[in-house]
Amino acid sequence: MLIAPLGGAEAYMAYVSNEKDNTVSVIDLDKLAVVRTYPVGQRPRGITMTKDGKFVLLCASDDDTVQVIDAKTDKVVRTLPSGPDPELFVLHPSGNPLYVANEDDNLVTVVDVETEKVLAEIPVGVEPEGMGISPDGKIIVNTSETTNMVHFIDEKTHEITANVLVDSRPRFAEFTADGKQLWVTSEVGGTTNVIDPATHQILKRITFQIPNVQAEAIQPVGVRVSKDGKYAYIALGPANRIAVVNARTFEVEKYLLVGQRVWQLAFTPDEKYLVTTNGNSNDVSIIDVAKQEVIKSITTGRLPWGVTISKD
């Protein structure tokens, strides 16, 4: 049992999927160190926690399944029917169901986490990847990489209610905490579009310029917006930077240098830290959110892809 640090702060654990090693690294964010690593299915990518924090959900992409892992024992206890090549997913705010992007079949699969049954298969664009859900759970969003669209899906009917064209290869979708904005990154387009979910209009198209970094190396992927709506943090892939964006003015305020090919990112629940996965340098970066600076690099397995964080 880990003892909380002085001052009564909770200890958080980060779970990192290592795509090339077929493992998950567990990082104690009090010690800022990997405390254990365990084997999982083939090509692990998307990763999240169940609402109660008891289980890790993991896309084992080459096994065509979602694995359910006991967070205490690190053992796979069951699998969920995900459809082929699951890459990213999003869990309903209530904890059930799970919405899974199936890249090979151009579908979003809706899975009941408790009964392990497929509730629906929703046809979307070509190469679906990014998944988002509104805070009230009423709107599900999928991005299709080849169609270059954001698909808005009704929770009850599982029907697409709107399609929004964005820049090339949209990778990730993140609602703000108030549900009034949707941030969508476009990897090849090199941009991030902020969309009004109510009107489906693009509010702002954010571009990035980094001194001494070629434009084609700036490839936005993961994005997270702080709960207070003040800042967005965007992973810029081979540019090896996190863009810190003022979420009210949409201006880029700074770039934080992290590891190589930064891909995904996650806040600790208290938003003290932001953890980034850096695929080509086989590590994660720990960002002090208040100071907006990188304080630590931690070696993981090979090709760290996704990250999720919960209380220990």
Give the residues covered by each predicted segment.
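Predominantly soluble domains enriched in secretory-pathway, periplasmic, or organellar proteins
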Residues: 1-312
